[in-house]
């Protein structure tokens, strides 16, 4: 079981996924999402009607004059009837919706219906109607969507590395997002980082009585009651993400909405292109950008100073440009950025150390992206724009709480992560001068002398313990004595074997 969900829910979701096994994973997820959203649209409409009744206000249903498009009206139709109703009536109707007050409606208006088999639709509707999938809370919806994303390996299908949830948690704890932040992921993929930031802020702003855990340790029922008059800003002007792919843009929107974020600002645009002109806008950026994507240099932003073949160099400069003064960032980069001394590698590091305060370099182990991706050496860089670097805190993660192999079996699920967070928060008050340990400080001047090398092993001091084997003459005599013992034992064994042969004769 993954994501600590109940076995009965996992079983039903697996059945749902199997129904769409002939589709590519992204298309399958979209079709499942559209069906779930159609059900939620009627539920949202019913809630608004009840609220209006209680407040003695007039209310026009979004389904007015189109009642046959309500989930409850067609969900129990026969196979032939349901496929015609959904294809020929429901989907043409939802594409005409323009009521921005309905959070599900505006993301259904561009939906396309691609289910051709009537039985697939009938069985999918039955599963979506099950009690296990209808707790009517963002916690359950979020778990459902997170499970679907993982089982369908959406990021892998789109040639992206899924950042494990516990590594996302680590990065969030290092930059501490707040409701006052403007948070961006310029390469957001499924929106995983933004969703985690949303949950973190919600938890930080929920009173203890509203922070509950189920039997698997999942936190739920977060009310965010301390947000008070900041709710509107939190929902509308806090989270921003961008994707090159239209399908991934839609997936990210659905993911965030299923987790409870009502108005995610997710756009389809290449943030390296000239069409994307934002700068100095965000107070927090958290991401895992593509390392080796090809870059269309003929359509690249004009404010870049690097000229490279690999996309990671452009993304690092982009992140710097997007941050406001005092803005923070946690970003995953390949090891080559850390130790590289070529022109572009050095230029990017000079930028992050001369015009930002590079707070930390955290070395991750090779298997961190298994089982979702390949073995790759990476680091987390944490920096703050606008202050020059005086010293950099290095940490080598030896364990992340899972076995370091392709199976990635859970040990405790955390490994060094709590220690990293604790020591990072105490780095200005504790002594980190001992470079024989797994974390230490290195001054900017020393790093500069080493051509801006940011690799952990460059500064780690390894002390080899001296082993005293004693007097060499005595050691040789011991070896001779040992060999004599072996020889004598061999002769005794030979005598015994010869004796057995004579007796048998």
Give the location of each predicted region.
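Conserved S-adenosyl-L-methionine
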Residues: 160-287, 292-294, 303, 307-309, ...
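Conserved Class I SAM-dependent methyltransferase catalytic core
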Residues: 28, 244-249, 309-382
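C-terminal, active-site-flanking charged/polar segments
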Residues: 357-358, 370-420
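Flexible, solvent-exposed coil segments and beta strand-coil junctions
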Residues: 297-300, 358
């Amino acid at each position: 079981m993954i994501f600590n969900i109940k076995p009965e829910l996992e079983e039903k979701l697996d059945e749902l996924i199997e129904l769409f096994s002939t589709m590519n994973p992204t298309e399958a997820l979209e079709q499942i999402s559209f069906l779930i959203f159609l059900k939620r649209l009627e539920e949202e409409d019913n809630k608004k009607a009840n609220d209006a009744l209680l407040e003695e206000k007039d209310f026009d249903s979004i389904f007015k004059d189109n009642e046959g498009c309500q989930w409850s009206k067609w969900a129990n139709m026969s196979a032939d009837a349901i496929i015609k109703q959904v294809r020929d009536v429901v989907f043409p109707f939802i594409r005409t919706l323009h009521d921005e007050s309905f959070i599900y409606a505006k993301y259904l208006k561009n939906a396309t219906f691609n289910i051709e088999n009537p039985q697939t639709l009938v069985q999918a509707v039955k599963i979506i109607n099950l009690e296990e999938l209808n707790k009517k809370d963002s916690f359950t919806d979020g778990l459902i969507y997170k499970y679907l994303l993982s089982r369908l390996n959406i990021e892998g299908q789109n040639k992206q590395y899924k950042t494990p949830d516990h590594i996302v948690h680590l990065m969030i704890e290092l930059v501490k997002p707040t409701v006052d932040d403007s948070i961006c992921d310029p390469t957001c993929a499924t929106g995983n980082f933004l969703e985690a930031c949303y949950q973190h802020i919600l938890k930080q702003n929920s009173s203890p009585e509203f922070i509950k855990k189920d039997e698997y340790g999942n936190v739920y029922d977060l009310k965010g009651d301390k947000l008070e008059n900041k709710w509107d800003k939190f929902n509308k002007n806090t989270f921003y993400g961008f994707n090159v792919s239209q399908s991934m843009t839609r997936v990210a929107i659905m993911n965030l909405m299923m987790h409870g974020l009502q108005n995610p600002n997710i756009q389809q645009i290449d943030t390296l292109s000239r069409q994307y002109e934002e700068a100095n806008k965000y107070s927090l950026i958290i991401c895992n950008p593509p390392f080796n994507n090809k870059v269309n240099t003929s359509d690249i932003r004009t404010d870049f100073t690097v000229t490279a073949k690999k996309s990671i160099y452009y993304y690092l400069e982009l992140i710097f440009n997007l941050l406001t003064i005092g803005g923070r960032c946690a970003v995953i980069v390949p090891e080559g950025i850390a130790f590289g001394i070529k022109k572009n590698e050095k230029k990017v590091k000079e930028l992050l150390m001369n015009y930002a305060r590079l707070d930390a370099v955290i070395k991750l182990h090779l298997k961190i992206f298994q089982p979702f991706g390949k073995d790759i050496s990476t680091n987390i860089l944490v920096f703050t724009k606008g202050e020059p670097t005086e010293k950099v805190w290095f940490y080598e993660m030896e364990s992340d709480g899972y076995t370091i192999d392709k199976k990635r079996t859970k040990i405790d699920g955390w490994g060094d992560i709590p220690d990293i967070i604790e020591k990072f928060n105490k780095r200005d008050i504790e002594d980190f001068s001992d470079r024989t340990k797994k974390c230490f400080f290195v001054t900017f001047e020393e790093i500069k002398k080493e051509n801006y090398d940011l690799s952990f092993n460059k500064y780690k001091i390894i002390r080899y313990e001296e082993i005293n084997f004693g007097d060499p003459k005595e050691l040789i005599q011991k070896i001779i004595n040992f060999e004599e013992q072996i020889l004598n034992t061999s002769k005794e064994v030979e005598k015994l074997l010869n004796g057995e042969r004579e007796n048998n004769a």
